[in-house]
A protein has these predicted regions:
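Short acidic low-complexity segments
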Residues: 24-34
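FMN-binding flavodoxin-like domain, especially the glycine-rich phosphate-binding loop
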Residues: 2-5, 13-17, 21-22, 35-147
């Protein structure tokens, strides 16, 4: 759905200057995180475990497979989708949960998260926002490589 569309837009922007591999959280092999220099995680904000604003259930399953240092030394960017009209108190809280997950397992979210509001209500405006964020991320990564 919309999370995949956003991921594809980010992937397209990053592919301009970087080798990119993408997969669903349901298909990820936790041992492969060491194969990558930088990782982007994304999720809609869901009603999970009787609470609004949670990350996708696939991340809860992934968390069970991770070791305490699974993300040690890894850098991350995070994006989340939500609806500020219907869920203003929990808008894009999935981003907060993903940042906590990254920190809990030794990683570092190095750029502010992208928060996409009501994706399908303004696809064109949101696509512009997503592409701009991804281009900024691309520039950040290029600067990191040149150091």
């Amino acid at each position: 759905g919309s999370t995949r569309i956003v991921g594809t837009l980010i992937e397209s922007a990053l592919k301009q200057d970087h080798e990119v591999t993408s997969c669903s959280v349901f298909d990820v092999d936790p041992t492969r995180f060491n194969d990558f220099d930088f990782i982007v995680l994304g999720s809609n904000s869901w009603f999970e475990n009787k609470e609004e604003g949670q990350m996708n259930s696939g991340f809860h399953a992934l968390k069970e497979k991770l070791k305490l240092d699974s993300f040690k030394g890894k850098k991350f960017a995070i994006y989340a989708l939500g609806d500020s009209n219907l869920y203003h108190n929990t808008f894009c809280k999935a981003a907060d949960h993903l940042e906590k997950l990254v920190r809990e397992f030794g990683g570092d979210a190095v750029v502010p998260p992208l928060k996409v509001d009501r994706f399908y209500f303004d696809e064109e405006g949101n696509e512009t926002k997503i592409i701009e964020w991804a281009q900024g991320l691309n520039q950040f990564l290029k600067q990191q490589q040149s150091r």
